Amino acid sequence: MLKLEMMLVVLLILPLFYFDAGGQVVQGDWRSDGLARYLQRGDRDVRECNINTPGSSWGKCCLTRMCGTMCCARSGCTCVYHWRRGHGCSCPG
């Protein structure tokens, strides 16, 4: 019974190393690219950001799974996850 309990504890704790508290992938994780592609499919794609804090690179308006509470400062940009580089803005031309 002790082995089963220990195995359950390990299985519950192990995923915590792959994700931070916000549900976002920890940078440098080998699984991050697949999760980023999953989050960008269909209706899970991030919504357009609105300027919240002029003059700063991030505001607090994009409450999506991918960018958490971060948002791009420019209008028309979207918050994206770049494999091995983390979260950033994708802005039109």
From Swiss-Prot:
A single MF term (Gene Ontology): acetylcholine receptor inhibitor activity
GO cellular component: extracellular region; host cell postsynaptic membrane
Residues recorded with modification 4-hydroxyproline: 54
Annotated S-S bridges: 62-71, 67-79, 72-89, 77-91
Residues modified to 4-carboxyglutamate: 48
Residue ranges of the propeptide: 25-45
Expression sites by tissue: Expressed by the venom duct.
Location(s) in or outside the cell: Secreted
Broad class of the protein's primary localization: secreted
RNA-binding keyword on record: no
Keywords, in A-Z order: Acetylcholine receptor inhibiting toxin, Disulfide bond, Gamma-carboxyglutamic acid, Hydroxylation, Ion channel impairing toxin, Neurotoxin, Postsynaptic neurotoxin, Secreted, Signal, Toxin
Signal peptide feature range: 1-24
Entry note about domains: The cysteine framework is XX (C-CC-C-CC-C-C-C-C).
Subunit structure: Hetero-, homo- or pseudo-homodimer (identical sequence, different post-translational modifications).
Function: Alpha-conotoxins act on postsynaptic membranes, they bind to the nicotinic acetylcholine receptors (nAChR) and thus inhibit them. Through its two C-terminal domains, this homodimeric protein would bind to two nAChR allosteric sites, located outside the nAChR C-loop of the principal binding face and at the adjacent binding interface in a clockwise direction. This toxin specifically blocks mammalian neuronal nAChR of the alpha-7/CHRNA7, alpha-3-beta-2/CHRNA3-CHRNB2 and alpha-4-beta-2/CHRNA4-CHRNB2 subtypes.
Family: Belongs to the conotoxin D superfamily.
Descriptive protein name: Alpha-conotoxin-like Ms20.2
